Structure formats: C-alpha cells, structure tokens
Amino acid sequence: MQVKNPILGLCQKATFALSAAKVEQCPEDQGYEVAFAGRSNAGKSSALNTLTHASLARTSKTPGRTQLLNFFSLDDERRLVDLPGYGYAKVPIPLKQHWQKHLEAYLGSRECLRGVILMMDVRHPMTDFDKMMLDWARASGMPMHILLTKADKLTHGAGKNTLLKVQSEIRKGWGDSTTIQLFSAPKRLGLEEAYRVLADWMELEDKPVA
C-alpha cells in the first residue's frame, strides 16, 4: 500500500497571501506557520519554489532583494513564510538593521510558528548567521530543520561528507534536536524528506492510497 503525504497537495496549491514590512502587518497569529530562513544566495527562494511546484518566491541574480516577510497560504490555517535574506554586502547598513529588527520581532513573537527551515549552501555551511539561528532555536525551543542546498554542485561523496561533518558540529554545539539533510532544487533532491518535516510540524498525517 502506498502512502500519500498530504502536505504535497497543499504545497501544490500554495498561493501568495501578503507581504509584511513589520510584525504588525502579518496575518492573524493562529494556525500553523513554517518559516524559511537563510543567508542571501543560500538558495532559499529556489527551495521554496521547488517545494511548491510554483514560482511563488522571488528569485534574483542580486541576493538580498527579499526585504519583506512574504506569506504563502497552503489552506485556511497553514502558511509558509519567506523571511528576508540576510548578509548581502551591497545592502545599505540601515536596511540590514531594519531587516534584523523585524526578523527578530517575528521569530520572537509568533505563537503559530511551528518550525524554521534553515537554508545553508552546502559549499559554505555554518556561517555566523547560521550559528545565530541555531542559538536562537536552542534558546527558544523552536524545531529547526536544515537544508544543505545546492547539493548538485558537489559529488555525491563530497556532499555526504559535508552532511556528516555539519551534523557532527551541530550535535556537539547545539544538541540533537536539529535535523539536517542534503537538498538540490534543480535535481529535486531531498523533496520527500523535506515534505515529511513540513507535514509533521503542520500536524498532517500520511494517508494510505489504494
């Protein structure tokens, strides 16, 4: 008997809901939200678009252009949230400070936030931003799942070695609560594992398919 992950159908129906420059503009704080975070150029928008089978999240050759909290509805009570990209050098310092202020406000205040998907470029993992997010997740008790993106840029062996190395570093520094996987948007690598995490956080059960 095959088992169908219900999050797949919801992701395929994802629609843009709204953009918020600050927490006060976010949707009502109820239901289930999963946020996608990552340094600029870590492949966050590409991952979101691949998971939803759509071009919902804006991709740009200029990293750091995502300046707002962007909300995408899966159904009446479940949402994905594209957080501002962080760390692009050409972004003016006042704008960086604005992003950081409202990113911290969102992460610290949303009762409906069930988990954070953190994107790391598999070739450059564990940046200062990544460690800051891991510190926050541990302190707040927030579930976190890491996508080591752009896995297609490495050989299978090199990707696996990086996965094991980052896993070990996270366990030593932050414990066992954070999960991690390889992911490639162009190759659609790691989709099912990511869908299982989303379904678990959004309290959706797998359904048997005859």
UniProtKB/Swiss-Prot annotation:
Role played: Necessary for normal cell division and for the maintenance of normal septation.
The keyword Zinc-finger is assigned to this record: no
Keyword Magnesium appears in the UniProt entry: yes
UniProt-recorded Gene Ontology molecular function terms: GTP binding; metal ion binding
Cofactor: Mg(2+)
Family: Belongs to the TRAFAC class TrmE-Era-EngA-EngB-Septin-like GTPase superfamily. EngB GTPase family.
Every EngB-type G domain range: 30-204
GO biological-process terms attached to the record: division septum assembly
Keywords: Cell cycle, Cell division, GTP-binding, Magnesium, Metal-binding, Nucleotide-binding, Septation
Sequence positions that bind GTP: 38-45, 64-68, 82-85, 149-152, 182-185
Protein's name in the database: Probable GTP-binding protein EngB
Source domain of life: Bacteria
Entry GO terms, CC: cytosol
Residues reported in the UniProt entry to bind Mg(2+): S45, T66
Name of one Pfam family that matches: MMR_HSR1
